[in-house]
Amino acid sequence: VSMWLMLLIVGVNPWVGIVAALAYGLSTYFLLIIGAGHVTKMWALVYAPLMMGGGWMTLRGNVWCGAALTALAASLEIGANHPQITYYFLVAMAAFWISEGILSFKEGRLRDFLLRTAALAAAGILAVGSNFSPLWYTAKHSKETIRGGSELAATAETSKNGLALDYATAWSYGKAETLNLLVPDFMGRESGTTFPADGQTAAVLNDYGLRGAAQQLSAYWGTQPYTGGPTYLGAAAVFLAALGIALARGRNKWWIIAACVVMILLAWGRNLMGFTEFAFKYLPGYNKFRTVSMTLVVVQWAVPLLLSLIHI
């Protein structure tokens, strides 16, 4: 529902919005985190699209209604208590804000943009204020955890200012593994599973005299230590998103494309260490989070949005 409401705010046809919202809600990542019991992450992903919709309305539509919606949605988002998900969507919001700022400057609407920015900032302050107590104690106690760094020598899990780079990037998405977004099980299934005894892999191995070997081989051959399954967005959804990129107006699509590219590069983690090290050093707060492959949640949100843009 949150995704559908965001699409209505953007101006998508309600029926198209239903299809796009289902593409978001039925992506495999939701099923994986529900099965793993990541309830706070799930709720953060539920509220995030509405927060983005509020930001869209504030910067492009009715500024006061947008600010009110942003304050409400951001309050719920922060209250879901998964700062990592919130952080990634705020990065996407920043991409949108930068895009609007550049366009406003070119069109001579800088004063209006600054007013809308002030309203958006006020909404953010209200959202933070409504969650001040848990945020305060989280920030206070994080200094005593591995996310707060260490005054002693760096360990395998901590650095001077936050998590150690190797520890934070342990769950890095492989470059080829990114094709899981389009092709199901491109790098295999979840860790701990093996190939079926009556499958084609077993048949080929049997021809070489390796009977029973298929039941001892892992059905996942990606670069992550283990995984609950691939992040599959749907071939149809990705194809329609590509069509949306080709046909949509530039104002609507470039910031989304930029956010997707950045998030995919960040998800590669140790497989693109130069970019990851740069983000760790210079992107505020980024070194507090592990499992960098989680940045793909923004791509999961962006693909249904991109496929809807051709109807705006």
Enumerate the predicted regions with their spans.
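Membrane-interface helix-loop-helix junctions at transmembrane boundaries of multi-pass membrane enzymes
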Residues: F105-A118, D198, A203-Q215, L240-R270
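Membrane-embedded helix bundles of polyisoprenyl
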Residues: S2-V10, P14-S104, R116-T138
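Conserved small/polar residues in nucleotide/adenosyl-binding loops
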Residues: I310-I312
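Membrane-embedded alpha-helical segments of multi-pass membrane proteins
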Residues: M42-M51, T86, L90-V91, L233-A236, ...
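Membrane-helix boundary/interfacial segments in multi-pass membrane proteins
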Residues: F30-W43, S218-T231, V262-A302
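Carboxylate/His-rich catalytic cores and anion/metal-binding grooves
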Residues: S2-L31, G234, V238-F275
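Short secondary-structure boundary/capping segments
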Residues: G37-V39, A92-A95, A139-T155, F278-L283
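Periplasmic/ER-lumenal interhelical loops and adjacent helix-loop junctions
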Residues: F132-G244
